[in-house]
Amino acid sequence: MKFQFSSPSKIFLFSSVILILIFIGIKFELLEDTNSNRNDKFNNIINRFINYNIDDSIYKNKQQQQQFSNKIYSNEKKILLKNKIIDTTIKPSININNNNNNNNKLNNNNNNNNNNNNNNNNNNNNNNNNNNNNYYNSIEYYSSFVSRLLKSNDDDGIYYDDYQSKYKKNHYIVQFKDRINDETREQLKEFLIGTDITILKEQPFKSHIVHYIPHDSFLVFMTKEQSVLLSSKEWISWIGEHEPSNKIHLNYHEKSIGYPVYIILSGSTNSLIQRWENTLNSILTSYNSKVKLTLINQKKLKSIVYCNDESPSSSSSSSCSLIGSEKIVYKWISEQSESNYIERSEKLQTANRLSPTVIFGTKDKLVNNDRIDIPLRGKGQILSIADTGLDGSHCFFSDSKYPIPFNQVNENHRKVVTYITYHDNEDYVNGHGTHVCGSAAGTPEDSSWAISSFSGLATDAKIAFYDLSSGSSEPTPPEDYSQMYKPLYDAGARVHGDSWGSVSLQGYYGGYSDDAGGIDAFLYEYPEFSILRAAGNNELFASLLAQATAKNAITVGAEQTAHVNYVSDALEYYDFSDNANFQRPCLFDKKYCNYTTAKCCSEVSNVKGLQLCCPASIKQNASDSFTTQPQFYNENNMGSFSSKGPTHDGRLKPDIVAPGEYITSARSNGENSTDQCGDGSLPNANGLMSISGTSMATPLATAATTILRQYLVDGYFPTGESVEENKLLPTGSLLKALMINNAQLLNGTYFWSASSTNPSNAIFEQINGANLIQGWGALRMNNWLYVKSSNPTPPSRWIGIGGLGKNQKATEWKEDSLSSGLNKSYCFTYKPSSSSSGSGGGGGTPRIVATLVWTDPPSYSGAKFNLVNNLDLLLLNSDDDSIITIGNSGGSLQPAGKVAQPDTLNNVEGIIINPTKAMNYKFTIAGTNVPIGPQKFSFVFHGENGQFDWADSCPQCVDGVQFPCLITNGIGIQSCGSDLLWTKCIVQSCNEGYNYNSLKNTCDKFLSYNYIIIIVAGGTMVLIILLLMWIKYQEYKESKRDSFRRFDDGTGIFVRPKDKDAKVTPPDLYNLVSPFIIELTIATACSLVATAASILQPFYIGNIVNNIPTTKSIGEFKSDFIIIFILAFIEFLFTNVGSWISGIVNEKMVMRLQNKVFRALIAQDMGFFQRNNSALLMNVLIVDTPMLRSALTGILLSIATGVCKLVGSLVFIFTISWKLSLAFFAAVPILGLVTQIQSQFTKRLTRQLLFHNSKASQHGTESLTNMHVVTNYCKQEKEMVKYSDQLMNVFITARKLIITNTFAGTGKWLLIESLTFVILYFSAYLVIQKQFTVGLMISFSLYIGYVVDASSSLFGVYVSYIQCLASATRVFMILRSAPRKRTTLEEEEADRLAGLSGGGGGGGDNGDDKKDKQNIENGKDVLPSNIITPIDNVENSNGKQDDPNNNNNNIGNLDYSEQLDGVSTVADSTVGLTKRELKKQKEKEQKEYFKQTGISVAETPTFLPSSYTELTECRGEIEFKNVSFRYPTRPDVQVLHNINMKFEAGKCYGLVGPSGSGKSTTLELISKFYPLHGETGGKIYMDGIDIAKIRPNNLRSFVTNVHQHPFLFDATIGENIGYAIDNPTQEDIIEAAKLAYAHEFINDLPKKYDTQIGEAGNLSGGQKKRIAVARAICAKRKIMLLDEITAELDPESEEAITQSIKVLTQGHTVVMVAHKVAAVRDCDKIFVLEKGYLVEEGTHDELMANKGKYYRMFSEDKDDTPLQNNNNNKNNNNNNNNNEPSSSSTPPNDQPTPPPQEQQEQKNDQPPPPPPQEQQEQQEQQQQQQQEQQQQQQQQQQQQQQQQQQQQQQQQQQQQQQQQQNDQPPNDYDQVPPPPPLPSESPSPPTGNNDGQPLVQMDEENDEER
């Protein structure tokens, strides 16, 4: 029966859940509204922190220091956009008035704040008013929030109209009062998430932060309602709408008209874009133009405006005004709330034999292009390039084994791992992409070719290529650059080069475009990726390509190459026709306007001016210039064409320069697939060409970066050898920092023009070490890329990488990170060099170069400045922390005598100094402003011409100094430790709305309701789930040890079969509660909710106490009191619901469990009830079962509530003070030890208590049941004394249990009280020391109480579990011993293969299942020794012939001499023992006594066969064949010996013999009350079918057994008579009573048949016997077994019943046991038994004539009649003994069988209970004497028996021969005994043939066997 809720209950629970969810939601909103208050104290802390780091000793006076501080940490409230600078101190914030009086007050207060910043009192008043107004605004918002949730669907139309404008999302600029840090950013995010309501279908996207905008502002996409609520926050200073004019960045002029325009969105859908396009096209109808909108991704849209008669790809038309159309379109789009930035797409354009010698050279000399000077060439690295195409047939890229892998990855290709065909799969003639790839990594497959001298730089690296153009067109990359970079990244590339870009056509030179933002975004998401971009070839300042302005990319400019290149390769492979200029000759004379280069060259001798258009002349002039002016053409000069910086916001670009002039590399031959290299000889004009440009410099820098990455990844740094532990995975920022740090400013001349001078490059240094022309200088890798194998002398440069100092492993390196206000320092030492050689030594000027690089988040393209996170690099003297210099200072930007200006623009900062004396230096990186953090960074520095090393320590402070420190949402303090390092920042106070979290030492919202629910409920459920998983795992392990499956008998409770002595395990207990797991889960959930609600109450109580000193009115606590009340109500509600459900579960469980136990008892066979007392069994049913139920359900709920309360309280106490919490955990081991000791005593005493209770109950029941005997013998006083003794045992045991629990509880109480005192004392000390608040102390104390209570509950669970095991022991003994049926034949086979002994449990697997199975499949008869066949009568492994289906087998070591009270008797004899030994033995017995349960069951349970023969009708024929039997309680006494009898259908048979001869046992065997044991037990057949194969209930439906003692129920007489059949009629009952001659005395009773047995007084024995006979007659069974039914009847009744029996024999088989001859005189046959032997059989007359035992029993003169020799009697079945002779089973042959011993006789022929120990010993001695006598007699009889056997065999042979001759069966069934079986065979029962017919057929006439 499953647990079900009624309809009111469902409504009640559903309403409660809704109430809780609403409360949680409102609480979440309220907590979100309670934000940190950034007050003046917080700002003061920042200033003090800053002033400390910038020490007084830095500058001469305070004025300089203040100027510097103000410059760095300026809090100027201006929003810097490209189109506009917004001064938020002047421009008002958004209007949050909305006709609300309270909001008007808020605006007035805000104005007051702006106008009265110097008046502190007014500010405080205004802040208070603001807080009140914020409260009312919040209430108004949440009221509308709830009303919207409850609004019906019918109001959707009105709702949409009312709220469309209010909830339409738009872009707002939100400025913070203070610097943005991680916490304030997360606050804003949480606010947007918590207040976001998506109502409009066209705007399904969420509110979110779009971009950072300087200063201290975010561009936010949200609703107007959110902006109004956000403006009331204390931490917000200004909010304004993002005006449409600030979104547009377009110039409308002829050059740019018609080019695509990109619209950056904050969210979009296809339907939204379609709606835009339809609207715009309807507007443009009058302008004869259209617009095409294409969605690139969800945040980028491409727009093209075109005329109606042209396609979208056209640029202009005279038939329409595109300028006017574009202005209309983009003005309209800018007014749409989803757009945030609009910019024009720009026109894309593309922008080596000696180049490697330049890059890997030094400032003084070049190196050779070989493996000695350049040993590393990028092996194991993959670089990627996106360009116009790649000629795969060129020898630099072709592979003789593998083709080019197009759109797939194949790392087996020697050069190209993938070729992504975005446009096509080839390059055009003289293609740009082929040349670029050749410079980067191209090399022929045969390195011996001469052309290999022009190989690229990273010849061992492989290429991942992305094709950007089709044919000879300019490159066209995807609009979303991540679609280009991501496939290359996935192919394994980590360094990428782009030699192309776009040129702005609208005047924003060096502007930060959306393409640049896309590059920054990809690098920010994939920090290990590096992108190098060409600066451009526009030669002017601020002429960088748009993509080159990306902050995180490495922008590459072009320097000149080695001078030898100009006089050799350039003249050979450069096409000078590209330089032909026809404009100037045309201006001179119009006739030259149409000249060709050939015409120019033909007339150049006459007109020198034509040299300008003659390539040959141009080449000659160049050659002359190269030769005569080498100072203008060498590697120390910049390329004049290289684009220069800065960017639009003043950032320094390019970053580095590389050779880019006259670079000779691979030439493409277009579609021709022929290898243009030919035989690889030189010169090779088909395979090589020379080009100039930054496009040529970029692949060389890309290759150099790839080699640098190989250097780090392979572990060459810093030893110059590949070392495994030195392998480092670099980030892109680290590679960039290393490239820049080791770059070198070119110091050559710069070629302006022929008329100008050649100034030094030094005048262009805007900062120290860098300028706008060459950035940080040219790559010179040899200065530090040291490889020991090629150069054993270490370089003169010492290099340090931040985070890789002393004792730091390269394999564990990762970037450090900073948030706002934090810093990181690196210290090193410098000493002047004592020699000119050695590591770190040199003869030049000492020099220190440091570089800081970080990957900055992408910027908003419309911002005026594009740096988001600002870090600053400072160099300090570590001895006194005085600042020496700051990053990016010096140069022309810092005039002499002025204070160094901090860099707020670049994400690259450098410092270059020349140390003059030995000193400890400290580089400090400060997180000046990190709005999107934490910001990771890479720091690299090197020293040259001196001795450098990491410092042993890096001091950060002065010893003993304390200083306030910045913490999130609060204020802390830190001290300078003895190691001169700042200690951890300790929280001093938290801002409003935050609480101290001692676990993280921070101020968090960690203690909010939402987190508590998650931690407490979630954690508890996880623990419970883990517990259940552990139980199921244990159950799984148990199932692997046996082959049993758990079974259900209809009660819903499952029990796994085990041995009787097996321990009760948690899986066993879980099986009892599993049917109620749903109800218990609901009750547990209710308990969790109630416990969670109770846990929160101390927190709010503590808040009230904390706020009392600063509170003026009790009304301010209203919200806290309401919350406490709601929590208390929730606790009350769910506690009662949980108790109600658990109570119902308790009652249901005890009902089912008792039903289960009762079923197990009812299913037991008779042997079980002979061994166990019924009163004891009832005690288990009534006492143990409810105790087990209570413990089980109580344990589960206690675990749930205890864990819930413990986890939740621990969360609070740890967040309040983890130190105080340790005091509790110090007490846990003591509590656990006490509990463990208590549980051990409790387990033992509980078992004793249950046992003594059972004994007392048993004694009381027996005394009351046998009251006649007690009264008759006057033993009342004796029984009272015995019962008192039993109760005294109960009392003594209970007293011990009480004492144990009392002492344990007292110990726990003392420990808890001591713990509470210590905690209270220490917390009071902390309060006095101002380290703790009173409210926290009260909350902590309350939570400690919760923790202690929960701990005690959980420890009590363990004690309850131990008690549960004690009560479960006897219950499971009964449940496991219940007979049960196997469910499938497969299980029987599994049991057989597992080697189950006699069908019982236990494993007998020898691990050879495979062999066993093979034996079976091969049909072998011999099975392994451990395999027990399930067929009946097979000898068990214990040597005894036990029935596998019998619960009473003598299996294993079960001691059947145990007393019923469970006390094991010691087998050793007590004869000859001293008193001391007797005492010890008694103590030993006493110990064994308490180990017992009082219940005796078989070692293994009974397994019934999986299938039975079902009888639908019965003839009533019964046959005994070789039946022998022993009672399970007396296995040493054989009751029946080899009995052979046959009862034919429809006849009456009598069984007579002395008491104890086995008559009643025979009837019980027919009823299958006891199963036969093994092969020696013989067989009993009913209608030719072995009764072992018949289901017991099916068999008994045809058999009725009237016992010699009538058993009547406490019911009416009629109910007792009709008990055997269902729904008996009154006529059936009366008829049966008449036949039993009971009708007359029943009618004499007052109520006749309705008389209760108890109300009828004491019925006589005869009356009870007649009622029992009537019940048997009423059953109308085919076979009637009557046991002494006439024993207590008067002669008249006896005669009547005898006549009735004659009537019953008509159609029935009747077997009667009687001691009176009158009862059996008329039987068809009488069987005479004596001492378990069948001694005679025949009719009354025949037996009297034989004058045997029957005659002596019933004749008047017994002594005069001699006893016939039974061995010569043909009816004695013992003459034909089919079993082996046994001295104990064969009576003497020459004398009558001696009568049975009196002490073994039991009245009514029942097996006696075990005698007392002394009687048993006497009996054993007598039996031993008898056995000795029998052995002597046996020796005398052996010869005679052998002779008799020989005679019998001869007679049998003669009879068989005679039978064969006559072909007729014998006349008498019993005349011819069956032949003895072979030694290896067993007697086989009659079985059926394949057709289901009996093999033994009965002749209907003669009723004889064929």
Swiss-Prot record:
Its main location: membrane. Residues 1765-1779, 1814-1871 have a biased composition (Low complexity). The keyword Hydrolase applies. It comes from the Eukaryota. The active site is at 387 (charge relay system), 432 (charge relay system), 695 (charge relay system). SMART domains: AAA. Residues 1080-1363 form the ABC transmembrane type-1 domain. Keywords: ATP-binding, Glycoprotein, Hydrolase, Membrane, Nucleotide-binding, Protease, Serine protease, Signal, Transmembrane, Transmembrane helix, Transport. Its EC number is 3.4.21.-. Residues 1407-1420 have a biased composition (Basic and acidic residues). Residues 1-31 form the signal peptide. It is an enzyme of class 3 (hydrolase). Glycans are attached at residues 594, 621, 672, 747, 823, 1172, 1522, 1658. It is a multi-pass membrane protein. Disruption phenotype: Null mutations in either tagB or tagC lead to a cell autonomous defect in prestalk differentiation and a 5-fold reduction in the expression of the prestalk gene ecmA. Disruption of regA in a tagB null or in a tagC null background results in higher levels of sporulation. Residues 1518-1756 form the ABC transporter domain. GO terms for molecular function: ABC-type transporter activity; ATP binding; ATP hydrolysis activity; ATPase-coupled transmembrane transporter activity; serine-type endopeptidase activity. GO terms for biological process: proteolysis; signal transduction; sorocarp development; sorocarp stalk cell differentiation; transmembrane transport. GO terms for cellular component: membrane; plasma membrane. PROSITE patterns: ABC_TM1F (PS50929), ABC_TRANSPORTER_1 (PS00211), ABC_TRANSPORTER_2 (PS50893), SUBTILASE (PS51892), SUBTILASE_HIS (PS00137), SUBTILASE_SER (PS00138). Residues 356-763 form the Peptidase S8 domain. The chain crosses the membrane at residues 1011-1031, 1076-1096, 1121-1141, 1210-1230, 1309-1329, 1332-1352. Intercellular communication via tagB may mediate integration of cellular differentiation with morphogenesis. In the C-terminal section; belongs to the ABC transporter superfamily. ABCB family. Multidrug resistance exporter (TC 3.A.1.201) subfamily. This is Serine protease/ABC transporter B family protein tagB. It comes from Dictyostelium discoideum.
